[in-house]
A protein has these predicted regions:
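HIT superfamily nucleotide-processing domains
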Residues: 1-111
């Protein structure tokens, strides 16, 4: 996922939602039958860079996730929301994003 390329038109992704705060796209390398990335429009390197003032952004991001889970038909069975932080946390892109995954059962703890 190339979050930095979204605004340039160079990222090959299916956009599912756009508003002034959040963009949601289908992951180009899905790890579940439904795998969507929710990305803040404003550049935030990771969750470590969030502040109290980002509350409205996070509220919007989670509301969009819930709306997409319903529209994708995965809300009732359940889904997973994941934000990877740092190298050991699995973060591979230097832009905060949340994975919405569903359509199959997940194990705990994750790999």
């Amino acid at each position: 996922m190339a979050a930095g390329k979204l605004g340039t038109g160079k990222a090959a992704a299916t956009v599912l939602h756009e508003d002034e705060l959040v963009i949601a796209i289908r992951d180009i390398a899905p790890r579940a039958p439904t795998h969507i990335l929710l990305i803040p429009r404003r550049h935030i390197p990771s969750a470590l860079h969030l502040a109290d003032a980002d509350g409205p952004l996070l509220g919007r991001l989670f509301a969009v996730a819930a709306d997409l889970a319903r529209s994708e038909g995965i809300a009732d069975a359940g889904y997973r929301l994941v934000a990877n932080v740092g190298r050991w946390g699995g973060q591979s892109v230097d832009h905060l994003h949340v994975h919405l995954m569903g359509g199959r059962a997940f194990e705990w703890p994750p790999g």
